[in-house]
Amino acid sequence: MSRLLYISNLGKQIQYIEKAVATYPELLQGEVDLCNMKKPPQWDADFESRLRAADVVLVTNMGVGLDSPFLERLERWLYAHHPKYWIDVVEPKKTDILYRNLDEDKRILLESYRRTSGVMNYVRLINGAFSTKPTSEWEEPDPIPWQAIMGREGNIYKTYDEFMDAEGHRDWSSIAVYFYRDEWIMGDIEYQQALFEEIYKHQYNPIIFYGQYGSNPRVGIPNMK
């Protein structure tokens, strides 16, 4: 069976991979080895064996670049020894993207799955990493709104007017609070619902809204508005 080694220091991505593997094992077309880079693993024979056992290696990292000791060594090892990988490293002033044997149309769709988020999109990401089919035969990402206003029950509205018509009071002032989109997707909305009730109790419209930080037209992420 094919194996994907997913190396990341991004907490939400790690959660999505874990949940995809735990929830939908029957949908996955290969095995997943997850390496949490929040604390870089020791580079030893065991780690190299994990690299060698993987048919595909995907690396996502935020905060330090490929000039950091571990990532520099990883990039050099993959370049010398591995047939298929994709490294996407973001640091404050630049982004480094390196890859081998992943065509641009496949990278764009894999990135779209990853950035759109959601457990099923990570199932598609895992399967897409293994796939030899043309992307015309791949599934599109689930259409999860990039920005929305949350209602009392955790439901969402695409516009302010939609929210006001359904749950708002036109004669009240409004208080807006931003939260992260991935929190809504994962159902981590306890504090958002508590804020909603507290703001509403004082007769203000609670505009509890999420968005996606940073636009990316290449994969359809709009500017927040």
What residue ranges belong to the model's regions?
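An N-terminal assembly and electron-transfer interface module characteristic of large anaerobic redox
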Residues: 1-225
